[in-house]
Amino acid sequence: MPTIGVQMMMLRDEVGKAGPYEVLRRLTDAGFRAVEVSQIPMTPENVAEMRRARDELGVDFGALSAAVGPGPNDCLVERFDKIVADCRALDARHVRIGMMPLSALATTEGVVEFCRRTQDIATRLADEGVQLHYHNHHVEFARRGGVTVLDAIRAEAPGMRLEIDVHWVQRGGRDPVRTLQKYAGLVDLVHLKDYRIGELGPGALEAQRSGDREAFLREFAAVVEFGEVGEGNLEWAEIVDQSIASGAEYLLIEQDVLYGRDAFDCLATSREHLVDLGYEKLL
């Protein structure tokens, strides 16, 4: 059975203030035991605190994050050995790429070249006992020549598995449950965040009154929000059950924007909903 955990990107500010160990202690007190690390500097000091949390608190490091270009995570091209060493230090068996560089995503040729590089990296990581994964957003559901970018990634880099983010699947115009079914056996990691429709802002009314149709459409489309699990429109029992059926190992709560709420309060809301649905045994 998979473990429900937390994507630590949403706690990066707290880590910057209090350090990884204290944040991980608060997470375990809040009823979580697994994490995925992203956008947190993997300095020797931070890795040492994470390892301490593993040893003393029993934290399970489900996955670490990396990139193949500039960004907040270590680059697999330039720091391969360090990333492998971090995985060994934390007993992490999965490394995930949050997104390919936008310069690669811009063209079919760029996607193919990205896949060529990541396929080589996936093979090298596999030799070290680590599995590489690609995390989707909505843009990977763009169709080129009748094929989505995500399917092209699978075809061109078969050694790289998938991390399915159900919010971004929905935003990409696909059904999360059917997408998890489609990629069953290829998905070890799933991101849990809701797809919430917020209120129209005052800018929409102002644009309508002024006759600025372009501004109105921008405001009209900007109501999609990143919700706590259970606070939006996704069917969570179906999503979690299909994640289990598809072979996922970690289901990771994430929220890209908190809209002024405290991160731990957001996590508590998501956790409570999953417990109410009967998934406490996965925590």
Where do the PLM segments sit?
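N-terminal pre-domain/capping segments
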Residues: 1-93, 130, 161, 272-283
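Acidic/histidine-rich catalytic cores of soluble enzymes
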Residues: 6, 123-229, 233
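Acidic-and-aromatic substrate-binding clefts and catalytic sites of carbohydrate-active enzymes
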Residues: 12-18, 34-47, 67-78, 102-106, ...
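Active-site acidic/histidine proton-transfer and metal-coordination neighborhood
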Residues: 25, 41, 60, 72-162, ...
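Conserved beta-strand positions in the central sheet of alpha/beta enzyme cores
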Residues: 36, 63, 96, 133, ...
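A short, acidic, amphipathic alpha-helical segment used as a generic capping/interface helix at domain edges
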Residues: 231-244
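C-terminal/domain-terminus segments
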Residues: 250-278
